[in-house]
Amino acid sequence: MTIPTLTTERLLLKPLVAEDAVQIQTLYPRWEIVRYMVSSVPWPYPDNGAENYVNNVALPDMAKGIAWFWSIRRREVPDELMGIICLYDVEDNNRGFWLAPEFQGQGYMREASIAATDYWFNTLNKPVLRAPKAAANSR
């Protein structure tokens, strides 16, 4: 199944591609993002961390049909990546995301989460979505 671009009022959720690693590497390695991620994310974040994750984890899992990754972008600035949202077909953690701090507090992740959740239930026809998150990570 080809992963589609999802659109919302303000956002484009574009399927992750290898070229996104450059922008991810610029935005992601910040403690205010990484501290809320799973414990397997290394800190300090390595210089090739995004390239390694995109090419060796995310894209292969997308090809296997067990994950759906999107870069989050504003429709008005479609070349600028703001964060990532993903869905995983695993038992206890089906949705993950991060957003660069300068874009937080503006409702972007809520908008992206609604679109991804809709895709999970209405396109993939999954009966349940589990998304355990850090309670302190809220705005």
Question: Could you say what each language-model-derived stretch is?
Answer:
Residues M1-T2, N56-P60:
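Short, P/G- and charge-enriched loop/turn segments at secondary-structure junctions
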Residues P60-I66:
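Short loop/turn motifs at secondary-structure junctions and domain boundaries
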